[in-house]
Design a protein with these regions (language model features):
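Histidine-anchored nucleotide/phosphate-binding helix
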Residues: 29-42
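N-terminal catalytic cores of NTP/NDP-binding nucleotidyl/phosphoryl-transfer enzymes
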Residues: 11-13, 17-30
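Short internal beta-strands
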Residues: 47-54
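Short, structural beta-strand-to-alpha-helix junction motif
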Residues: 188-193
Length: 198
């Protein structure tokens, strides 16, 4: 309760050869929306913003379709599931600057400023978008939320190494036998990840 709070998704994937976020946005945008809705409910936020690369027009189109479907079913908008919880999401096309992958630079860009990192503290969780509490995570993090709730935190933790829990999606590219996306348990070596891909 209290001040307006925001959920922000950093979908401005800018690393050369990276397309993990793009595959989720184009292939399963509902998983991202579901994670943001759950996070919004938990944090008491009423608005979500997806900051997406402008160079991903198909991803933006698929997100818009998924958001329209969610609104039609009552998963976005006012009084979700009769709980009194209001939550909606909008998309903001990124400005194309690599630095906007840094959370405070992304927030500056959302506010219409030049996407430059800001000094921390304050951290976005306390003073983020428009100086209000902001939860900012990437596509993969939000997309994992519903799976973790459905299967349990321990099931996610069991997929990783002792000190690095869960799994991670990587884009394999370059001088390797077979490129593409691979999801592997945390702690797995790059060599073993490539072997699993072949």
């Amino acid at each position: 309760k209290g001040a307006q709070k925001y959920m922000v998704c950093n979908a401005d994937e800018g690393d050369p050869g990276a397309f993990m976020d793009r595959s989720v946005l184009e292939g399963d945008p509902h998983s991202l929306l579901e994670g943001m809705i759950i996070g919004g409910f938990a944090a008491g936020a009423t608005e979500g913003i997806i900051y997406c690369r402008a160079e991903y027009p198909l991803a933006i189109a698929r997100l818009e379709i998924a958001m329209a479907q969610a609104r039609e079913k009552g998963y976005l908008g006012k009084n979700l599931f009769g709980t009194g919880f209001d939550f909606d999401i909008r998309i903001k096309a990124g400005a194309g600057a690599f630095v906007c992958g840094e959370e405070t630079a992304l927030i500056a860009s959302l506010e219409g400023e030049r996407g430059m990192p800001r000094l921390k503290p304050p951290f976005p969780a306390a003073k983020g978008y428009w100086k209000l509490p902001t939860n900012i995570n990437n596509v993969e993090t939000y997309a994992n939320v519903a799976w973790i709730i459905a299967n349990g935190g321990q099931a996610f933790a069991d997929r990783g190494a002792e000190k690095s829990k869960g799994s991670k999606v990587f884009a394999l590219a370059g001088k390797i036998k077979k490129g593409g996306l691979v999801e592997v348990p945390m702690g797995m070596t790059l060599k073993r990840s490539e072997e699993r891909r072949v």
